[in-house]
Amino acid sequence: MSDHTLTLANGLNLGYAEYGDPRGEVAFYFHGWPSSRIQGSLFDDMAKKHCMRLICPDRPGIGLSDFQPGRTLFDWPETLTQLANHVGADNYHVIGWSGGGPYVLITALKLPKRLLSASIICGAPPLKFLGDREMFWLYRVMIQLRHYLPTVLGAVLRLGGLIAKGSPQKVPLRWLMKLLGQEDRRILNLPGIYEVVRDAALGALDRGPRSVIADADIYLNEWGFEISQINFPIHFWHGKQDRNIAWSYTERLASLIPAATSVLSDIDGHYSLPVTHAEQIIVAALQKSPSTGDAGQQDGNTGIDGELLGAVLRRQSR
């Protein structure tokens, strides 16, 4: 990993890390919540193997990036444009995991002519899509704290950071791991995987909970656009054992976007899908999307090799 900082036109610093092949096709990776640029290291090996230059910015207030008061999703395309120009990328891929998903969507809406492909892994949907029964209980609690006891939410996030520093094999983290599905627990217990997820989350908390809460507010507020306004094809990936974000949201999002594809795994969860299938996700992205000029007439021809998609998630249940 190599860390860098860019001073934006508004005078704020934007931090980012680079992974993969420095001479490869440029892809921007948008991290989840709470997370940071460090999360992109999970894709480093496969990005190198397939000649992808993976650039992972910290969102404002996270990690190396300065806090930006009052920002919305609509601020992101301009930030990304300045970063892309800085690294010399006229055209590029975008990939977002979990909380990075909405940033892929706004990029596809506002910057389609610069995109080569757009991929969302276990992506967060608009809040209006979420029903109480479908929402992860921890998110429900945090939303209530944000509305009624914001200072308590800050304390909860600090406590979460302290707990995360422990071992997933020991209490209390071992208890919390039981909230996840079997495959997610297996993946997070592999050497080095939990440490990356943990360090990425702690990187988000480096400057205190204010920035993490402000980042969450983006998801809680109205996004300011309808999903159906997006004409650029999105490649969606989701695991049916995801207990953080239900796979049904991905199906709903995909149904609203012309020529979108959705690849679902019966046995994967929120963490196991991107870690286990990083290579397939990157290969599919590099095959690029079809022209958006007649995206509504693609009739399922998405530009992703059908044999690849058919084989991606054919693992046997353990």
Residue ranges and their predicted role:
Residues 12-64:
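Conserved HGGG/HGGXW glycine-rich cap/lid loop of the alpha/beta-hydrolase fold
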Residues 58-63, 68, 124, 268-269:
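Short beta-to-alpha linker loops that shape the active-site pocket of alpha/beta-hydrolase fold enzymes
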Residues 259-318:
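Catalytic active-site module of serine/aspartate enzymes centered on a nucleophile-bearing elbow/loop
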Residues 138-225:
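Alpha/beta-hydrolase
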Residues 243-249:
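Conserved alpha/beta-hydrolase "acid-adjacent" motif
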Residues 230, 236-238, 242:
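Short beta-strand/loop motif that positions the catalytic acidic residue
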Residues 75-93:
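Conserved acidic catalytic loop of the alpha/beta-hydrolase fold
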Residues 91-133:
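Conserved hydrolase catalytic core segment
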